[in-house]
Amino acid sequence: MAHYKGAASEAGRAAQLMKKREIQQQEIEFRKKKIEEELKLEKIENKFATHYDAVEQQLKTSTIGLVTLDEMKAKQEDIVREREKKLAQKKDEKDREKQRALEAIQAEKNKQKRQIQALSFNLADEDEDDEAADDDHQESDKEEEDKPKAAKWTEMQDEIVPIKKKKICKNPDVDTSFLPDREREEQENRLRETLRQEWVMQQAELKDEDISITFSYWDGSGHRRNVQMKKGNSIYQFLQKCLELLRKEFIELKTVMADQLMYVKEDLILPHHYSFYDFIVTKARGKSGPLFQFDVHDDVRMISDASVEKEESHAGKVLLRSWYERNKHIFPASRWEPYDPTKSYDKYTIKDKDKAKK
C-alpha cells in the first residue's frame, strides 16, 4: 500500500478516502459473486430432469400393451411437443400477468397524481375566491371613501399641462468619417487596386522605352561607342550587347564573357543585377554626376554658373575586371568604388584627392 507524502492535515483525508475505496471494492466483489451464483448454469441432467420425468410418466400412462419401436418414438415426440407447448403457454401467462400487474401499478400512480393535481387546483380556486370576496368588500368601502378624492383628482388633471418627451435627434453636421464603414472601405480598396494597376502599367511602359547609351571601352584610353537598349534592361544585358559590338575590333575580348566585364558610371562600379530603370526612377547620383542620364557631356557644371547643375553626364566606362585589379591604385581607377544605394553623393568631384595631398 502506498503511503501519502504531503501535509499532515491531508494525511487523514487521504486515509479516509482509501478506506472508502476498499469498502466499495468489497461491495463490488460481493455483488459480482452473487450475480455469478444466480447465473451459474447447472449440469444438463439437472436442468432437464423434471421435464424428462414428466414426459416418461405421461408415456407410461398412455402406452398400453406391446408397441413397436417406431410407434414408441412417435408417441414420445408427440408427448414432448405437447409438454413444450404447455410450458410455453405457462410462460406466456406469467409474462401477461406481470405486464397486467405493472399496468395496474402505473394506472394507480397516474390516478394518485391526477387526484393530487385536482386537489391543488381546488385549494387555489378556494383561495382565489376568498381573496376576490375580500377584494370586493374592500373595493366597495374604498369607492365610498374615494368619491370626493376622485373629484379633486379630475380637477387637478384639467389644470396639469402634459409634458412632451424630447426625442433624441442626430446632428447631421458631425464628422463620422472616423467610424468604420464597409461600403467606404470597399470603395477605397477598389480605388487603391485601380491606382496600383495603373501604376504597374505605367512602369511597364516606361521599362519598354528605348534609351541610347554612350559608353567608352576603357583599356587605359577611351574608345567611345553607342548602343540602343531598353530602360528595363539590366547592366548584365547591357554588357552582353557591348561585347557583341566590341569583339569585332578588340582581340582580347573574343574569349571574354559578360561576367568578366565591369561598368563604371560617374566613378561608381554598378552591380550587374541593377537595371537602368532603377537609376532613372530613383534619380540616383554618383560621385561626379547623375546616374539617370546616359548621354555625353564633358563637365556636369556650366562654366558661367557653377552652382547650377546640368543633367548631362559622362560616358560610362566598360572595362575588363582584370585590368581594374591591375590598375586600381592608379587614377582614375583609384577613385572608383562599388555603388551603395544608401550612400548620398551631394557634392560632385572630378579631381584625384590622393594626388592633391601629394
Swiss-Prot record:
Domain of life, per lineage: Eukaryota
Listed Acidic residues bias regions: 124-144
Region described as Disordered: 122-152
One Gene Ontology biological process: chromatin organization
Transmembrane segments: none
UniProt GO cellular component terms: nucleus
UniProt similarity note: Belongs to the FAM50 family.
PANTHER family named among the record's database cross-references: PROTEIN FAM50A, XAP-5 PROTEIN-RELATED
Protein name: Protein FAM50 homolog
Organism: Drosophila pseudoobscura pseudoobscura (Fruit fly)
Organism phylogeny: Eukaryota, Metazoa, Ecdysozoa, Arthropoda, Hexapoda
